[in-house]
């Protein structure tokens, strides 16, 4: 999961354009095959086993214009699918939710950019209308954020919006149920780990990619399914592998 691909790096989830390119090259060298969220959904629904040997999904939250300017050309170059979760009430505007938290103003993609990246193989998902903490809203407000963002994107893009990402990773069971009831088929959290056959498709795990990550740490995080990529995570990974073999 990435948010921004820009210089200067102004928050943790921002990755420089050069580093993003090297990370995509790293995935290719390591033998990973990026898949779409529709592919992943099919895996959960049909339990089929014809995903590539080392599948990985690339996702972006918020839809900053630098995703279009810096990340999209690299994705096209490598022919990698990806998903970008848009805040429907701020398309073509600015990141007001970040500004309130002390971050600088940054432009978001508009409808023209969205239409172009869809043609280039990018899946558009919903990230609510206003990027709120959903569990802090009353039920009606939360349902509106989840449902109307989907409808707005569908109406403007003329295509189904099947995938959702929880702003801030903020969720509980009532929120998860709202997402299901709204007609989405998957939803992404910010919990780290691998997505297996028994993973809830409405609480998909993701690995956070941070601006300070070296290429070595990026590779380690992808391999271990962790947000940290340190030695203790590596030890825990191999212990889990051993435990799975013993069972």
Regions found by a protein language model. Name each.
Residues 1-58, 66, 136-247:
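C-terminal active-site subregion of NodB/CE4 polysaccharide deacetylases
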Residues 28, 73-80, 107-126, 180:
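Acidic (Asp/Glu)-rich catalytic clusters
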Residues 41-44, 69-70, 99-120, 147-148:
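Alpha-helical scaffolding within the catalytic cores
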Residues 79-101:
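A short, conserved beta-to-alpha structural element at the edge of catalytic cores
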Residues 83-85, 125, 185-188:
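Structural detector of well-ordered beta-strand residues that form the stable sheet scaffold
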Residues 86, 125-128, 163-168:
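Short beta-strand segments
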Residues 93-105, 132-139:
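Surface-exposed cleft-lining segments at the edges of enzyme active sites
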